[in-house]
Swiss-Prot record:
It comes from Streptomyces collinus. NADP(+) binds at S22, R23, G24, I25, D71, V72, N98, K165, I194, D195, S196. The keyword Oxidoreductase applies. This is 1-cyclohexenylcarbonyl-CoA reductase. Disruption phenotype: Deletion mutant loses the ability to synthesize either cyclohexanecarboxylic acid or ansatrienin. Inhibited by the thiol inhibitors p-chloromercuribenzoate, N-ethylmaleimide and iodoacetamide. Also inhibited by various divalent cations.
Length: 280
């Protein structure tokens, strides 16, 4: 027996909204879905030229697409993004919460503004976006959030983003239960060391051991690719994943099994700064 989502995908072109879709994993996913003949909404914050280039590539790959400028760090931006989708498409089949940003600091150096912005950039857009997506998924759909290895392992200076990713994975489980009666599946994809343009920012921070030393300890002996991440997300968006919900799929080449980097790998670089005092 086909689910509502399976029946609708057989009858019409699927509409997929991807935040942060002008580069990296988001762009690769957009092209992957385009090759399936879908309509892709390319959300971007600043670089209109890059977003329009992605739209052109989507159309060359056999799909349809359009770009929407919206800063999802603001509640107004999230609302404007989904208003545009509602006006132009009238419905939504897939919502992929991909955009992310963070500062990388020791916990004792974080100020209230860092915490507020991390919440506003990473967690709130996913929750508010999911609320809006449900209203447009009148016949079932799929929601996928991007997570990372830092949600389950402690990296130097990664607490702020890792904490947000852990929260996202928790929200995925709650949403899966609440949205199931609507025929909507909600999952997360947790990437390890993925060879993307973001890896430079997310990994190369003070206190991390050399990346090659970590790669040598991963069972797969290499970083993942953005295409491997996109293929996993696309699987969760497809009919073959109809009975998967509330889960976090790990794409890390075995990284989390052996759990590097080890503290000993970093040596003195992992030493904590002096304990702050109230007089400091």
């Amino acid at each position: 027996m086909n689910s509502p989502h399976q029946q609708q995908t057989a009858d019409r072109r699927q509409v997929s909204l991807i935040t942060g879709a002008s580069r990296g994993i988001g762009r690769t996913l957009a092209l992957t879905l385009a090759r399936r003949g879908g309509t892709v909404v390319v959300n971007y914050k600043k670089n209109a030229d890059l977003a329009q280039k992605t739209v052109a590539e989507v159309e060359e790959a056999g799909g349809q697409g359009f770009a929407v400028q919206a800063d999802v760090e603001t509640t107004e931006g999230v609302t404007a993004l989904f208003d545009e989708v509602a006006q132009r498409c009238g419905r939504l089949d897939h919502f992929v919460s991909n955009a992310a940003a963070s500062a990388f600091k020791n916990i004792v150096d974080l100020g209230p503004h860092h915490l507020d912005r991390s919440y506003a950039m990473n967690l709130r857009p996913f929750v508010l976006g999911a609320q809006q997506a449900v209203k447009l998924m009148d016949n079932g759909g799929r929601i996928v959030a991007l997570s990372s290895y830092g949600s389950v392992r402690a990296y130097p200076t990664y607490a702020m983003l890792g904490g947000m990713k852990a929260a996202i994975e928790s929200w995925v489980r709650y949403m899966a239960v609440e949205f199931a009666p609507y025929g909507i599946n909600v999952n997360a994809v947790n990437g390890g060391l993925i060879d993307s343009d973001s890896l430079e920012f997310f990994y190369n921070v003070e206190g991390m051991p050399p990346m090659q030393g970590v790669l040598d300890r991963i069972p797969a002996r290499r970083p993942g690719t953005v295409q491997e991440m996109a293929d996993t997300i696309a699987f969760l968006l497809g009919d073959g994943a109809g009975y998967i919900t509330g889960q976090t799929l790990v794409v890390d080449g075995g990284l989390s099994i052996v759990a590097p980097p080890f503290f000993a790998d970093a040596g003195e670089a992992l030493e904590l700064p002096p304990r702050p005092t109230r007089d400091a």
